[in-house]
Amino acid sequence: MSKVYDWFEERLEIQAIADDITSKYVPPHVNIFYCLGGITLTCFLVQVATGFAMTFYYRPTVTEAFASVQYIMTEANFGWLIRSVHRWSASMMVLMMILHVFRVYLTGGFKKPRELTWVTGVVLGVLTASFGVTGYSLPRDQIGYWAVKIVTGVPEAIPVIGAPLVELLRGSASVGQSTLTRFYSLHTFVLPLLTAVFMLMHFPMIRKQGISGPL
């Protein structure tokens, strides 16, 4: 076993990386409220795992979506648990993200030199809200249908470009298969990819600049 470790150590300097991680200075004012960002990340990872599991059974069509969700909840092994954990962690992710934003704002974590960290965090907040909107429509039940109809209809009030924006969001003049396909693609591919990209920008900046000082 030591030979295997030595082989990797010689090429990757694993011990130096481990020492850097474990020896990072943590300011004495840090408390549990500074863990909210990490909890949000944990919720996101749970979302990825449970969401991936549900893609094996979910069918993104207007005729089969609701029935496939019913199948997940009643027939698939532990499907009810996986979907419930997905929903609970989604709510927890939104709550933790909001509390994290408040903590950062109240402790001045957005000030120089951490402006870019704040900007990437705001983008992650928008992506989190987008997860909620797109995911809400996927069961294709009455609540999801009307929620999507209202949300996608909001831009209609914008002069000139309102109607084209609505059609772009829905994929047609009304909420239908094109809308479900768009939202499913956004929810399962585009948004997770963008979230991962901005997280890979967000965390190294925190690592480099350290935790902001007390007020």
UniProtKB/Swiss-Prot annotation:
Free-text remark on how the cofactor is bound: Binds 2 heme b groups non-covalently with two histidine residues as axial ligands.
Keyword annotations: Chloroplast, Electron transport, Heme, Iron, Membrane, Metal-binding, Photosynthesis, Plastid, Thylakoid, Transmembrane, Transmembrane helix, Transport
GO biological process: photosynthesis; respiratory electron transport chain
Ligand binding (heme b 2): 86, 187
Top-rank lineage group of the source organism: Eukaryota
GO molecular function: electron transporter, transferring electrons within cytochrome b6/f complex of photosystem II activity; metal ion binding; oxidoreductase activity
Cross-referenced InterPro entries: Cyt_b/b6_N, Cyt_B6_PetB, Cytb/b6-like_sf, Cytochrome_b_N_euk/bac, Di-haem_cyt_TM
GO cellular component assignments: chloroplast thylakoid membrane
Positions annotated to bind heme b 1: 100, 202
Localization: Plastid, Chloroplast thylakoid membrane
Membrane topology: Multi-pass membrane protein
Cofactor requirement: heme b; heme c
HAMAP family for this protein: Cytb6_f_cytb6
Record's subunit section: The 4 large subunits of the cytochrome b6-f complex are cytochrome b6, subunit IV (17 kDa polypeptide, PetD), cytochrome f and the Rieske protein, while the 4 small subunits are PetG, PetL, PetM and PetN. The complex functions as a dimer.
Physiological role: Component of the cytochrome b6-f complex, which mediates electron transfer between photosystem II (PSII) and photosystem I (PSI), cyclic electron flow around PSI, and state transitions.
Additional note from the record: Heme 1 (or BH or b566) is high-potential and absorbs at about 566 nm, and heme 2 (or BL or b562) is low-potential and absorbs at about 562 nm.
UniProt family annotation: Belongs to the cytochrome b family. PetB subfamily.
Protein name: Cytochrome b6
Source species taxonomy: Eukaryota, Viridiplantae, Streptophyta, Embryophyta, Tracheophyta
Gene of this entry: petB
